[in-house]
A protein has these predicted regions:
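Charge-rich, intrinsically disordered N-terminal extensions
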Residues: 1-110, 116-150
């Protein structure tokens, strides 16, 4: 077990280094698109949390694999783990994820099909993610089985 954890930590460190480069390039890409410094900062902060907290939470997953993890992030993990989870923050993260994976597509790191699937999933699932958040935050719901729509 200690060897497995040491390997996980080593893999995570390598991914964090790659993520730092990606985030710097993403920041430059957003700036070139004409976004304000504040907006660029918000998008980069959102992606830092997604890449370096969520994707590395249980396994060492590189940024490219995150395109397949948006539903579990916005529909469950973010609601559970982020104290600041709100309707507006879920929408903000969704916008950031679309921008980041558009950037990743332009860099040739994900396919057009994967990008299209991500955008479709966000559009289709957003109402359910927001409803899940509302149930999670409802003080009258005491049984967590009533929160998550499995």
């Amino acid at each position: 077990m200690p060897d497995d954890y040491a390997k996980y930590e080593k893999d995570c460190e390598k991914i964090r280094e790659e993520n730092a480069k990606l985030l710097a390039d993403f920041s430059d890409w957003l700036t070139a698109k004409g976004l304000s410094e504040k907006t660029v900062g918000n998008h980069c902060s959102n992606m830092d949390f997604f890449l370096n907290r969520f994707l590395l939470y249980e396994d060492a997953k590189p940024a490219e694999t995150g395109v397949f993890e948006v539903g579990s992030f916005l529909g469950y993990w973010f609601i559970q783990k982020a104290m600041w989870a709100s309707r507006s923050s879920i929408k903000s993260y969704a916008a950031t994820l679309k921008k980041f994976y558009t950037f990743m597509h332009e860099k040739g790191r994900i396919t057009q099909e994967d990008l299209d699937d991500l955008k479709a999933e966000i559009k289709e699932e957003m109402p359910e993610w927001l409803a899940t958040l509302d149930r999670h935050d409802d003080p009258d719901i005491t049984d967590l089985n009533d929160v998550w729509d499995y």
